[in-house]
Every structure is written in structure tokens, then in C-alpha cells.
């Protein structure tokens, strides 16, 4: 069976869509391509089962829609699987319908957090054949293809489909597969080079993405779209992840690896992994980045991670207001945020913080507390970089349900959930929300901030990184200046 895993170009577009491997969707002015780990695992698993796999990322390949469409029609796959998200699902419905007109015998599949939350909607609104729910696209797509080829008589749980004129499903998705059973991702099949340079996280290139777990052991943040995909927590063994790190170093010359697990494993798992990095000598060959929670690690943990080769730790700050931290179930205090940043920085690590503006219950004065904390952490060097965004309540999240219950939604036109404007009612104007986002990125022009960055330069990798980072900052300022 010929199977295409496709990311169609989206035209017209206000920028590059951050779709695959993204918990939030944005259009970026500056080209950014992030390796979609689970779809890449799906491609590898299908190829191992002797299917013919076409890795078809028209976005990262920078194809026009016309070229992409002509090529996919010419290839005539038996199955086309596409990952979608809330702001672009209507575009994908139109693409699905065009594909079904040209390739009526091809089965078209949608997967992602939006269709997991609202699976029946896509079957009602488009000619799509199957909707995969939950985040295990690899296991589910394999099960679907084996069913279509007659190898399995029953579809796995979590699949929605048509049965005549009726919409049916196989029940709730299950996340009970052992992640260590998955094969090592075939990076050549999935064209890893497309994603190895244009990424703001990478200080050294080429870079690569991996995932030690699915997805976050906290998994309670009310705004996170991936809690819809992964309501439970699983992780691979430290040895399997170490083997993948070695594979990326030895086979592809990768110099920086981003582990995009929602929150990297801690405790004994982390200690075993770090000691393995040191024992195998990988800490001398590659730099590691990961997502982490404030107050999850001790100073000794940070120091061990530094010795193991970690560089960038991405923390979700989200707000400096205790009431907001409570309402979105962060389980944090402002003091823990500051202490963790200082401890990580003191160990020689580089904290990156994410901040959001536009909560329905926050006034402009409330949001200024967050802006001021973010600016202070950056200027004083306790945080190295920042990402600021507008809060978007994605379907399937507790925040979306809270918005519906309190009449906080300005619209349910999904295309407007693309972070170019607030879609929740707030005490602030849209212009004020965007001004707050820009206010964080304007720290890049602060003299003390600039001086600290210049003093941190250690070589050509740093200079190239700062050049790329400067372009990204200007892009973000443009992104949130648009009307």
C-alpha cells in the first residue's frame, strides 16, 4: 500500500504555518520548520511493515500549492494522512474535498488535536474518510493500513469513519502501547534536513528533534491542546533515548537535539539518562535542549544536566499573577518561577520562558506584572530567551469549556484562532494585548540585555545564532503588529 503523510502548502497565507510538532498554532514571518516526531515515527513504522511511504511536507519543502497538488495526484497514494489544527482545519476540509474529486479511490485521513476534540465535525464538513483521535498517530495509522489491506479484521480504538450514510467510530482512543516497541525513526525517509537549520531553538546546526515521552507528566494546564491528544503519560527507557542520541550523532552529524516531550522526565530517569550521556561521551559531541517545569529540579539536578550536555531549558511561565497560575492549573508560584530560573542560570544552563497575554480575567494592569517579570528575567540574565503569545482556547481543552460556560468566546470561526487576534473577551483591547506581546520582544533593544548577549559570545556558532535570533525577533514584532 502506498501511504503519503502530507502537509499541504496553505495559500494564501500570512506567513509560514507552524503546524506540525506545535502545541500552539502561529503564522511566522520568519521561516521556521519543526520536525513532526510522531508523524515521522508513523512513516518509519509503516515502511517497516513494508508499505511504500511518501514523506510529503509541502510546507517545509516550500512548494506552491499547485505544484504540491499536481505531484500528489500524480503519485496517487492509496492513503493520504494529514495533521491539522484548529486555525487551518477549514482549509484542510477544502483540500480534502479537492483530493477526493481527483482521487476518489484514495482514503484521506485527518489527525491532530482539533479532530480529536471534534471528530464528527470533519466528517460532517468534508469528504474525509477517516479521523484518527489521540496522539499515537503512528500506531493508529499502522492499524488503519493493516485493516485496509485485510491484515486485520478490526480497526483499533479511536478511529472515526463512514458506514454508509452514518458516522461510526471504534470507541475512545487508548494510549497503552509501549513506546520502546517503536523502531528508531528513519531520518532519511522523513527528510530530516528540511528541519535541521531554520529553527529558533538551535544554537548549533544541524539540529534534530526527538521525544522521550508522550507527552507531559503534569498534563493539567487548562490551555494546552496536547492534553487532548495525550491525557496520560508514557516515556521511553533512558537507554532507548540514549541510543537515538548516538544514532543522530554518528549517522547524521547532528550537533544539537531538542527533546520536545511536553515535560522532560525527572527523578531517577533523568539521573540515569544524564549519567549515560556522560559515560558514552555524547555530552562532548552534542548539545541538548528540553521542556521543563519550574520547581521540578534541584540545583544538583541542574548541575548534572549541564555536565550531561544540556543547554536550553524551556519553561512555561505563562503569567506572573498567582490567580492566573491557579486558574490554568500551573501548580506554581511566582517565587518558584524566579528561583528556578536563577538556579538553572547559575548552573550554566539557558532558561527560555514562554509567556501568554489575553486571559479573560486579567486586566491590563494584571498583565503588566507578567510583562515586567519577563523583562526583568531577561535583562538580568536569569532567562536567556522568551516566547510571548496570545492565549488561544483550543477545542478540547478545559479553557475552551470554561470560555463556553462563561460566554467568553468572541467567535467560533476556527480560522480566527490563529493568534493574530484575541478570540476571548478580555478587559483589554486587542491593541493592548498585542502591545504587551511586542513589549516582551522589545527587550532585545535594551542596552543591558544586549551587553549580556555580546559578552556571552564564544565563537562562530554563537554569532550565527544571534544573527538568526535577531531575524526571529524582528519577525515576531511584525507578526504581532499586523491588524
Enumerate the predicted regions with their spans:
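Conserved acidic residues
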Residues: 78, 129, 255, 311, ...
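Short glycine-rich His-centered loop
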Residues: 3-31
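Radical SAM enzyme core and accessory elements
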Residues: 2-5, 72-73, 78, 398-400, ...
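Glycine-rich beta-alpha loop elements in corrinoid/cobalamin-binding modules
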Residues: 38, 45-46, 51-175, 392, ...
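Flexible glycine/acidic-rich beta-alpha junction loops that bind and position SAM and/or redox cofactors
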Residues: 12-16, 267-268, 323, 327-328, ...
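Radical SAM [4Fe-4S] cluster-binding motif and immediate context
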Residues: 180-181, 185-352, 357-359, 372
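Catalytic cores of alpha/beta
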Residues: 120-124, 301, 361-376
